[in-house]
Amino acid sequence: MKRLLLLPITLLLCIVSLCAQQVDTVTIHSKMGHDLKNVVILPKSYAEGNTRYPVVYLLHGCGGNYASWITIKPELPQLASQYNLIIVCPDGLINSWYWNSPLNKDMQFEDYISDEVIRYTDSHYRTIADRSARAISGLSMGGHGAMWNAIRHRNVFGAVGSIR
């Protein structure tokens, strides 16, 4: 009887483990000297094979943080699986506007988003490392940051969206 129960319990633990790995929080040490957290959402199919995936970068609004998107849109993991893509939600602090400050070297968020986060994601995950497979979007301040970064880094992002 114990052996009969062991198999279903083992299978259940494997399934739970795979689901738990779908949403990661990673920390990137930026050139600004900040340790910044990012949510990375992988499609369920990521665990299978060697497929490379397109990436959507979602920037949060003013007053938010890296976890804002997963909080306001908890179905993001299902959407990542439905559309077979990776979603990355970087931290832009509460008011960076995702651009480089000419006065404060600790606020170089354009470089962080368009260079550091991209390089980290492409080197740690199986991405399609090409502008044609990268999109950036955001809400409010994040929408501004998405438009700003996409226009200034056309070689990095192939699609852009802005919400509100």
Residue ranges and their predicted role:
Residues M1-V23:
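Bacterial Sec-dependent N-terminal signal peptides
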Residues A20-R164:
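Non-catalytic cap/lid and distal C-terminal segments of serine-dependent acyl enzymes
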